[in-house]
């Protein structure tokens, strides 16, 4: 798999994306794309569509190429967790423990925290003002309520790639 940053055309097919909706707008982030040379590329952009206003997806550049990352939204902001990332063109894929935030109103990105463990396949949710990161590759669940804490390790349902942690 090539893991470089790649300019992808609009309306291309990609897999292993993460998606979330915020205020009638759909965001599809990262993923894998197979280019004309049959190389697999980790995508460094996000597609956005306001279902009431837009007739076509618009493209927003992400600070790093990501795949298998978790995503959630709260108060109109998008939060990203873990996954595999590429920061330099043709660099290696690396497990990621970064929690980053995107503000759609200002088009600004922020790094806000780091989980305890680097996670290659993750899910993210926020419940009662607490972030939970589910590691699908190693079965860990971490939570953030002021500091990161490991809440479960080797949880079988997570390791089995379940959509539900229990």
UniProtKB/Swiss-Prot annotation:
InterPro entries: Kelch-typ_b-propeller (IPR015915). The keyword Ubl conjugation does not apply. Kelch repeats lie at residues 25-76, 77-129. Keywords: Kelch repeat, Repeat. PANTHER family: CALICIN, KELCH PROTEIN. Belongs to the poxviruses Kelch family. This is Kelch repeat protein B10. It comes from Vaccinia virus (strain Copenhagen).
């Amino acid at each position: 798999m090539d893991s470089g940053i790649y300019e992808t055309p609009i309306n291309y097919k990609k897999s292993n994306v993460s998606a979330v909706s915020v205020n009638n707008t759909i965001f599809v982030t990262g993923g894998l794309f197979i280019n004309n040379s049959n190389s697999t590329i980790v995508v460094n952009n996000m597609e956005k569509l306001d279902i009431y206003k837009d007739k076509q997806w618009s493209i927003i550049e992400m600070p790093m190429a990501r795949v298998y990352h978790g995503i959630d939204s709260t108060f109109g902001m998008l939060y990203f967790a873990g996954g595999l990332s590429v920061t330099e063109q043709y660099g290696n894929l690396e497990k990621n423990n970064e929690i980053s935030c995107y503000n759609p109103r200002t088009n600004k990105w922020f790094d806000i925290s780091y989980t305890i463990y680097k996670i290659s396949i993750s899910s993210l949710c926020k419940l009662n003002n607490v972030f939970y990161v589910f590691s699908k590759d190693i079965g860990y669940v971490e939570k953030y309520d002021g500091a990161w804490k490991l809440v479960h390790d080797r949880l079988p349902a997570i390791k089995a790639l379940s959509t539900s942690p229990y």
